[in-house]
Amino acid sequence: MTTILGLTCISEQLKDKDKKKYSFRTMTRKRFNDLCVRDGRDEAIKELSERIAHNLYVTQYILRHCHSNDIRHYRLSSSLFPLLTDQTLELAYTDLPNHKRLDTELRFIGIIAKTFGISLGSHPDQFVVLASANKNAVKNSINELNFHASIFEKIGLPQDHTAPMNIHVNRSIKDGETLEDIAEIFYSNLMKCNAGVRSRLTIENEDKLSLFNIDDCIKFSEYLFETHNYNLPVCADNLHHLCNPSEVLNFAWQAERCAYTWVNQGEGEHNFIAPVFHWSEGKPEKPRAHADYIAFGNFPPYIAIDPDKPAKWEVEVKAKCKAVKLLQEQMAGAI
């Protein structure tokens, strides 16, 4: 498979030029509530809306930077819209005084990405747990996913896995449970999500030993397809595989198995969807934590599928686009 390198969320190169201009801005619940007390709720919402507008401008800058550096996939930051899915605050997108302007900026993000041939995806909050036994956790998860999908619609992204929304199953198999039991809970709650979620959702293997490894994810995906005719592609993460290995340790072989779950829109060559995978390395002293850069020798893994078919690799290291640039140079030198 050919290799497409992807950037995740932040551009360290842009931040080196102007940290304030190119950094995403967030807002904590405490900060919002303090503003409400000091200046009133309307003023607090106004400040929040301006921070969100800034985040959309930063995203546009990053997409242009991706184009200039031949990066053809980008994972949108999950922090673009702070607090809007915090149900305790009772905030809605349309409460933002500049929401129509934000609609325009989101459409422009889509235009930039389409013009430059950059695919987009996301990785919603790690606390999204569709298979949870906690009803409130499920409610919050559905709300989070539906919101992400609504933003994808405003951007103008296709309702398929070329614009993946990637999550973890985030459940261990407890005594008396089976993987199939968890799959049924997951599927039942997924069907409560809107069509934009259902058509884009993917899952990835996890880094904790008690949670889903690649084998579990593939079995999970196969069960949903065979039982409900629902396709759930699997994103392979190499660092998570090292921390929480499957029976077969060879990651390239496991990634190949995952790649076949992305052929999901019917029969025929034209229905192949390029898989989106994750590549990272851990710190020697803390293996589950992302290192700054990637050692080129192990990347990209050889996946024995048609060499003309692409695989997208979101590079998950602290140096972000600096690491992508270095990988590009190393790969070019190896040809």
Which residues does each predicted region cover?
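Short, well-ordered beta-to-alpha junction loops that form the rim of enzyme active sites
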Residues: 77-81, 124-125, 170, 205-206
